[in-house]
């Protein structure tokens, strides 16, 4: 808030506008220039544990900057489908926000690629297919 003022809005029960769901949330994500991944807890360091917003934000059309938590790079390609910042390094996050606020075409290309990757690989259908394949492949 100090750095970006009214251009920064925190959505959620503990945020500026409370909880938003459904179509209004789609519109917010799609119209925002940048959505920041929500793992800002600096004490958080669990590999392969990240929020569903990793998939929700690009799936709803957002350009996303997300903390580089181990395993995220297996889901999206950094710099091509989303942008990763060093977890806990708020200077790195600010630098990337400032860069992408002034590079519209690059930001839009990454946003679109992230949306397509999500629709291709990160839907509930693909998750259920993976679960069922794993269960049936490992049947005793």
Spans of model-derived segments:
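Nucleotide-sugar donor-binding catalytic core of glycosyltransferases
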Residues: 1-78, 138
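Short, contiguous hydrophobic alpha-helices characteristic of membrane insertion segments
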Residues: 64-67, 81-88, 131-140
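Two-component system phosphotransfer/interaction surface
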Residues: 90-102, 128-136
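A charged, aromatic-enriched C-terminal amphipathic alpha-helix characteristic of glycosyltransferases
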Residues: 105-133
């Amino acid at each position: 808030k100090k750095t970006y003022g009214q251009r920064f809005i925190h959505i959620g029960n503990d945020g500026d506008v409370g909880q938003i769901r459904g179509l209004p949330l789609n519109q917010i994500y799609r119209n925002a220039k940048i959505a920041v991944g929500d793992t800002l807890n600096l004490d958080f360091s669990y590999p392969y544990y990240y929020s569903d917003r990793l998939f929700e934000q690009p799936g709803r059309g957002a350009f996303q900057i997300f903390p580089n938590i181990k395993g995220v790079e297996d889901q999206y390609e950094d710099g091509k489908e989303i942008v990763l910042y060093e977890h806990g390094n708020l200077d790195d996050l600010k630098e990337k926000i400032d860069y992408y606020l002034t590079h519209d075409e690059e930001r839009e290309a990454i946003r679109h690629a992230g949306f397509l990757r999500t629709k291709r690989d990160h839907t509930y259908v693909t998750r259920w297919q993976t679960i069922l394949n794993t269960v049936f492949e490992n049947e005793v």
